[in-house]
Amino acid sequence: MLSSNECQQIIALVKRQVVPAMGCTEPICVALATSRATEELGCRPERIEAYLSANILKNAMGVGIPGTGMVGLPIAIALGALIGRSEYGLEVLKNCTPEAVEEGKAFIKEERIGIHLNEATQEKLYVEVVCHSADGHSAKVRIEREHTRFTYVEKDGEERFRSDLGAGEETKNEGGDLQLTLKKVYDFATTMPLAEIEFINEARKLNEAAAQRSLDGNYGHNLGKALSRPLGRGILGESIFSHILSSTGLACDARMAGAMIPVMSNSGSGNQGICATNPVVVFAKENHNTAEEMTRALMLSHLTAIYIKQNLGALSALCGCVVAATGSSCGITYLMGGSYEQVTFAVKNMIANLTGMICDGAKPSCALKLTTGVSTAVLSAMLAMQGNCVSSVEGIIDEDVDQSIRNLVSIGADSMNETDKRVLDIMVNKC
C-alpha cells in the first residue's frame, strides 16, 4: 500500500519528468544553457564556447532544429543566444522566426561558436556553455544529469549559483526517499483518485496533435505516412496495430525533422514521450476503453518509463525506445484487462526482446526504432494476456520483474559503455 507521502512524491516526479518539449532535447538542452548564459552576460555574446559530453554530441549531430530547416548544434546554440528564453525550459526556441534564423546563420558564418568534446566528465549528460562579450565580460552555465538541471552559473568568474547535485557521487534515483518498484508503479496508476492523475492527459493532447500535424508535411523518412498509404495498409491492413505504428511514426517523423511541433516528453526525451503515449491512446480509442481506463493506462506507461530511466540515466548507449515502449506495453496490457501479473509478463517479454538496441544519435531514422519498439510492445502485451512470458531460465530474465529491470539497466548503463564510445567514433569519423 502506497503512503500518502509516496503518492505526492510520485505526482511531483511525473510532473517534473513529463513536460512539453520543442525539438530534440539534446541540442535544445545546449540552447537552453546558451540562453541562460546570455541572460547572465546581459548582452549578445561575441563568442560562445560549448563543452559537451559524448552523448550530447552524439544525439545532436544529425537532428533537425525546429523552425530552421537545419540540423545540428551550431544553429541551436546561435538561436539560444539570439532569441532563447531560459524560462521556457525545453521550449526555449519557441519564439524562433525566419529573421532569427538568418541572423543565426550569420552568427555561424562569422565563426563565433566553438563546440568541444569534454572527455574529462563522467556525466553522460553534461553541457557547459561560456559566453564572451566584446568588452571582456563572460558568463558560464552548466547543465548536468537532466536536460533542464542547471548545476552551475557564474559571471566574470564570480559564482552565482551552484547545485550540490552537480558534483560528487551521481544520484540516479531521485525523489528523496522514494524507492519505486513496478508494483508501486502499477498500484499508483490503477488506484489513485482519478482527479489527481488526469494531468497526464496533456500528453495525449500534445502527442496526438503532433501525429496529426505530421500529415500536413513531408518529414524525415515519411515512415508514418508510408504506413498509412495503400502499400502499408495492403500489407498491415486497417487495424489497431497498424494505426499504433503510423501514429507513433508520424509524430517522430515530424519531431526529428525539426518541425515546429511541441510534444510531451518523458525523462528528457520527446521520442520517449511519443512512445509512451501514442500507442496507448490509439489502443484505448479503438478498443473502446473508457476515459478513466485511458488515463490510468497513460499514467502506467509514463511512470514505468520514468522508473526504468531513473536507474538507467537520462542518456545511455541503450535506445530510449526500449524503455518507453516497455511502458506502453504495460499500458496496453492494462487496457486489455490485464492484471499486475500480466503486466510483469509484458515487461519481461519486452526486456527479452529489445535489450541491446543501440542509440546512435537522434535523427530522422529514430522513427524506425520507435515503430520497432511499439510493435514489440503490442506483441509482448498479447503474449502476456495469454499467460506467456519469457522465463527465468532464458537469458537475462529473472523471476523477479524488478531484478529483470535491473539487469536491463546494468547492460544499458554500464556494459554498453564501450559500444557507446565506438558508435560516437564511427559517427564523427564518417567520410
Locate each region found by the language model.
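Acidic-glycine-rich active-site phosphate/pyrophosphate-binding loop
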Residues: 1-11, 43-56, 239-258, 290-308, ...
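A structural signal for small-residue-enriched, beta-sheet-centric alpha/beta enzyme cores
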Residues: 2, 22-25, 55-56, 145-147, ...
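Early transmembrane hairpin of solute transport permeases
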Residues: 31-131
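Hydrophobic alpha-helical bundle architecture
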Residues: 38, 283-290, 294-296, 306-372, ...
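Flexible, glycine/charged-enriched surface loops at secondary-structure junctions
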Residues: 44-48, 88-93, 114-116, 194-201, ...
